Amino acid sequence: MELKAQATSILKEAILKVGFEVEDSELQFETSSHADLASRVAFRLASIHKQNPKELASRIVSAIEIPEGSYIGEVSAAGPYINFLAGRHYMDETVTAVREEKEKFGCGAPKDRILLEHTSANPNGPLHVGHIRNSIIGDTLARILRRAGYDVEVQYYVNDMGRQIAVVSWACERFELDLSRKSDAAIADVYIKANVELDKNPDYVKKIDALMEKVEVGDLQTIERFDKAVSLAIAGIKETLLRLNVVHDKFVNESRFLKSGEVHDIVERIKATGRTETDKGALVVDLSDYGFEKTLVIQRSNGTSLYTTRDLAYHEWKAGQADRIIDVFGADHKLISGQLRATLNAIGIKEPEVVIFEFVSLPEGSMSTRRGQFISADDLFDRVTEAAFEQVESRRPETSTEFKKQVAEMVGIGAVRYDIVRVSPEKSTVFNWKEALDFEKQGAPYIQYSHARACSILEKAKDEAAWDPAEEITPSLLVEDSEIDLIKKMAMFDSIIDLGARELKPHVLAIYARELADSFNQFYRFVPVIAAEDEKVRASRLALVDCARIVLANSLDTLGIGAPESM
């Protein structure tokens, strides 16, 4: 990022010299195959001032002065583009910074407090692959934001009182729970049976309605039944998330906002705006001036609240906890999240930033907990790690079973996380576990293997070349094209973190990690390291391998993926 800051300063000064003035945002920097940074500012200025963009770019470049010790090595005009190339000082400083900062490399200065909510699946059964896209996007975003310097708290909003939970509670009383199974799977078994019963006997629906009304008025026995069922499901969900390397700082129950009176208060505040009306006995909010034709129901005709109402109260509470609020929702929440933001805006409450993701599926088809037509995340993890174990066994038959299991778990879970997060959230995707585990496909196993390869090279160097990691080196000896490419790729890490944090796009880090692994493998393929004849060159190249190891490990850690030292 410092390279861009210096380019910004130099370019703005040159533009002033030729008689114009621009804001930083108008410099329009982008990456280019021809330069480390390229600016399109000549296009913008030429269109405003009716000049030739090529000629203007040349005039600006002629006015540029590169100060002593700058990270900028060279500036040139290529048609209307102004291209910046990093200088030697930039490369040397990057190597030094990685070696000194290690796992802190790429960390930003302290910033605001963020409250990020993700996953928040209904506690009516195990998580399936559709849920875990939410978990993986949310967890990776939290990791990126933390590395960027934000103080992040991650929350799971527990639906502990909606209709589905009433069905779960009723099911737990009506059918025997098989507690020899994982608790969320046992809940799913009875939930599925209950839905079959409800479809056959519509009269049972009245019992569900009665349970919901009892919870709403605070009936302690019914609340206790709900709590017991929810706790069982959440315990199983937490196990699954832990295996996926996803951790929430806080689980917040929906019912607390009803008990505290905050739901009642927010309904009254919405009424005070004059936006509410009655529709068949239900209280609805008119949001037509926000572009929503459909009204938002906030109270049923029987006076009970809805999930949406309680969610509004939750968001009001969240707004007082942090500077920024971020929600990760599936595409099916696009309408309701828009209505929620509009309603909060109408009553003067800070709106959340919403990350909407499209759905992920398996080649086998769609998933639904209600009908039991789903493959649980647990089953998926088991399948993937079994397949990973077979790969480790074929590649490293001499290792212990314990080693194979550890690596298989790291590689299998890493493959799931990477394959899901590498796709931009707004695009739907199909998770193919066979492709995700393919070492040649440049997914997580490829990146993990690159890290393990770097570790292996360094271990070998300690034995064969008496390499000392603390030894002073001369980064300026790293002059081969593949060395320079690798250094420049490592130097991009902090700007990638910044981009992912600014745009809430975790996939940019996944793509970067793969490109970094590519750069490292290209370097090792074309340049002798341990076999380098000159001792100083050898030491510098081994230091570069160590730098690559550090930045690969930092990238994997920020993606929530393990970085094995051996595979």
From Swiss-Prot:
Asked whether the UniProt record includes Zinc among its keywords, one would answer no
GO biological process: what's one of them? arginyl-tRNA aminoacylation
What Pfam families does this protein's entry cite? Arg_tRNA_synt_N, DALR_1, tRNA-synt_1d
Question: Chief localization class?
Answer: cytoplasm
Kindly indicate whether the keyword Protein biosynthesis belongs to this entry.
yes
Q: Where in the cell is it found?
A: Cytoplasm
Instruction: Write out the catalysed reaction.
Output: tRNA(Arg) + L-arginine + ATP = L-arginyl-tRNA(Arg) + AMP + diphosphate
Which domain of life does the UniProt lineage start with?
Archaea
Which cysteines form disulfides?
A: none
User: Transmembrane stretches, by residue range?
Assistant: none
Give the PROSITE patterns listed for this entry: AA_TRNA_LIGASE_I (PS00178)
Family, according to the entry, reads as follows: Belongs to the class-I aminoacyl-tRNA synthetase family.
Q: What is this protein called?
A: Arginine--tRNA ligase
Query: What organism is this sequence from?
Result: Methanosarcina acetivorans (strain ATCC 35395 / DSM 2834 / JCM 12185 / C2A)
